[in-house]
């Protein structure tokens, strides 16, 4: 039997392990393809936590698949979610992807002011060199989405926000403009899709690469609760931190009084209590179901 038989799926151990990120493991299928496997690991404040979130890898994969299908832009997918090259043990949280020459920047788009963007704005009135109007507050909607790139850091290090000029210097004006325009266009379309479902896409991070023809291709994960901030549209009001469908719940617990942990201590964060694990899992699943309109229980490999 060949690999086209579902009974003859390869073992994960048959593939060469190329790299491990905070959440994903990358394996080589052949000269032109990789297997991208999303784990249940969760990271916060540049630490990989000791506690995993059950089903998180499947939610990330399901959300990425939904948006790769919904967004009209070339992407790195090279097979269906049940591709015979995917081992049984990782079905539902793995994708067969084209190998790309990845761009050296995280392509962040912000439609609302929060997080590190808000911190920078309060100090300088700008975000990544972009001057913003006066009087903006926590969670303010920006006049238009802004492109705020960051350098790619190694696991355990901080990504560093940079100005658009830095991207131009590194990649040239044409490629830098292409990255910015593509990022903002994809964010804008995704924000429309989410808002139709009652969800605000506050900001997100994309990664792009070049294929064998030198064409720009959307890679990695896309518009997941790991790479994006999602807020419920109902009850949204600028001026305070919004409830979220992403890992902000974990961040809030870690920096709250119950954890006993200081994010500036350099010490590994404590294990998450079961209540935080379950609440985080529920938020991830809720985000997927709300935005996609699909039931997570029908996703391949799920036992919800």
UniProtKB/Swiss-Prot annotation:
The similarity annotation says: Belongs to the SAICAR synthetase family.
State a single Pfam family of this protein. Answer: SAICAR_synt
* Catalytic reaction list: 5-amino-1-(5-phospho-D-ribosyl)imidazole-4-carboxylate + L-aspartate + ATP = (2S)-2-[5-amino-1-(5-phospho-beta-D-ribosyl)imidazole-4-carboxamido]succinate + ADP + phosphate + 2 H(+)
What NCBIfam families does the record tag this protein with? Answer: PRK13961.1, purC
Q: Source organism's superkingdom?
A: Bacteria
User: Looking at its record, which EC class is this enzyme?
Assistant: ligase
A GO molecular function term, named singly, is:
phosphoribosylaminoimidazolesuccinocarboxamide synthase activity
Which keywords annotate this record? ATP-binding, Ligase, Nucleotide-binding, Purine biosynthesis
Q: In which pathway does it act?
A: Purine metabolism; IMP biosynthesis via de novo pathway; 5-amino-1-(5-phospho-D-ribosyl)imidazole-4-carboxamide from 5-amino-1-(5-phospho-D-ribosyl)imidazole-4-carboxylate: step 1/2
Q: Does the keyword Transcription apply?
A: no
Name one cellular component (GO) term.
cytoplasm
The record's Gene Ontology biological-process terms are: 'de novo' IMP biosynthetic process
Please tell me the species this chain comes from. Answer: Corynebacterium efficiens (strain DSM 44549 / YS-314 / AJ 12310 / JCM 11189 / NBRC 100395)
Q: Report what the protein is called.
A: Phosphoribosylaminoimidazole-succinocarboxamide synthase
UniProt feature coiled coil, ranges: none
Q: Which gene encodes it?
A: purC
This entry's Enzyme Commission designation comes to: 6.3.2.6
């Amino acid at each position: 039997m060949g690999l086209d038989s579902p009974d003859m799926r390869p073992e994960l151990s048959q593939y060469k392990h190329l790299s491990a990120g905070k959440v994903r493991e990358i394996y080589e299928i052949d000269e032109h393809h990789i297997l991208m496997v999303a784990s249940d690991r969760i990271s916060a404040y540049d630490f990989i936590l000791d506690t995993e979130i059950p089903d998180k890898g499947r939610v990330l994969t399901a959300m990425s698949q939904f948006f790769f299908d919904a967004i009209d832009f070339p992407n790195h997918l090279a097979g269906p979610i049940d591709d015979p090259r995917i081992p049984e043990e990782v079905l539902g949280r793995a994708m067969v992807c084209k190998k790309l020459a990845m761009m050296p920047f995280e392509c962040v788009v912000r439609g609302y002011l929060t997080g590190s963007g808000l911190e920078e704005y309060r100090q300088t009135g700008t975000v990544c060199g972009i001057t913003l109007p006066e009087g903006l507050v926590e969670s303010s909607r920006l006049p238009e989405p802004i492109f705020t790139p960051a350098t790619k850091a190694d696991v355990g290090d901080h990504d560093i926000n940079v100005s658009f000029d830095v991207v131009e210097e590194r990649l040239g004006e044409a490629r830098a403009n292409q990255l910015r325009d593509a990022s903002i266009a994809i964010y804008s379309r995704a924000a429309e899709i989410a808002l139709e479902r009652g969800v605000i896409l506050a900001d997100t991070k994309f990664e792009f690469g070049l294929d064998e023809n030198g064409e720009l291709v959307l890679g990695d994960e896309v518009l997941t609760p790991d790479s994006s901030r999602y807020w419920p549209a109902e009850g949204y009001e600028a001026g305070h931190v919004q409830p979220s469908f992403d890992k902000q719940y974990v961040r809030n617990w870690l920096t709250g009084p119950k954890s006993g942990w200081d994010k500036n201590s350099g010490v590994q964060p404590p294990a998450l209590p079961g209540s935080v694990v379950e609440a985080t899992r529920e938020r991830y699943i809720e985000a997927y179901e709300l935005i996609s309109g699909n039931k997570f229980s029908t996703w391949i490999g799920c036992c919800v």
